Amino acid sequence: MRVFANPVGDGSIWFDNLATADGTPVAYDPQARTFLPMPPFCANREVIGCNWIAPEQGAFCRACAMTELAPDPSIPNAIPNWTQTEAAKRWVLDNLGRWHWFRPEDPGARPVFHMLAEGPTPVPMGHVGGVVTISVAEADPVLSITRREALEEPYRTMIGHMRHEIAHMLWWRLSLREDFLEAFRAMFGDERADYPTALQRHYHDGPPPGWRMSFLTSYASAHPHEDWAETAAHLLHLTDITDSFVAAGLSSPEQPSAGWDPYVETDAERLIHVAASLVAGVNHVNRSMGLSDLYPFVLSDFSRRKLVFVHDWLRRGAQGR
């Protein structure tokens, strides 16, 4: 993510800022990718702290307009959790906008979000036909850690959930193209394999032996749909980590040039090589403070080829249907 210029003075603005350091209200314009010191502000600004501009005063911004169902406010912590969930959604949508997904120039369908709070029964997250269902309860760090440990996952965050579920929607968009499915099946396998049976087998038997040689996560080994979603989410992780590193003014010997833009990079292998070197370095720094790795995953040769495949399609796919 970029670091933005203060529109009314010196200093920087961060992506989630509602105001400058001196208290001037600001809002983010996702089309121009800049902050403005004036309305119209999103109608959700006072409700969930949305800091995007709206087409007119009293209207929802581009991101909030995609939320069709909001959580039941009578459920404890629903609104604070929704606030964090929508912030993660805005972050991921802006990342994807760098490749023109879901912007006005994108002729295809937008995701529709169902943001649901949890009562006694957990809410299953997923995607069906352009509708992305998200459990806002996962924004609660205690619940997220509890579930991460129960599922033996090395990483579980709301941004991760957003990237994964939106990746399913991106696959659905790309599958409408005549040239996608054959190439996808050659790389990931046939997605027509029975999905419920595959997940049941995964949760009963676990991943196949040696899965790390072919998959980024054990869950990716369950079914081609999940392999795509995990791989696409990881491409977004790695690209945004690299972009944030550059935006922070840091540099690396692997970085092609000063001011290099990972989202403009056409050579996916170079992007992945740079990202891999950065996460290895940051993982090492985190360990110096006894912290968990920023990116606790291994990039096998086959996983890198899948990342290259996803990069190629996500960079050019938004101009299709």
How does the language model describe each region?
Residues M1-C64:
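N-terminal cysteine/histidine-rich coordination modules
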Residues F4, G11, A220-R321:
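Pan-zinc metallopeptidase signature
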Residues E56-T85:
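Fold-level signature of zinc-dependent metallopeptidase catalytic domains
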Residues P80-P141:
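Auxiliary, metal-adjacent structural segments of Zn-dependent hydrolase domains
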Residues R110, V123-E149, R177, A198-W211:
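A short mid-domain helix/strand-loop element embedded in enzyme catalytic domains
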Residues V142-M162:
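Short pre-active-site segment immediately N-terminal to the catalytic Zn-binding motif
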Residues R156-R177, A229:
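Active-site recognition of the HExxH zinc-binding catalytic motif
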Residues W172-T242:
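Post-HExxH zinc-binding segment in Zn-dependent metallohydrolases
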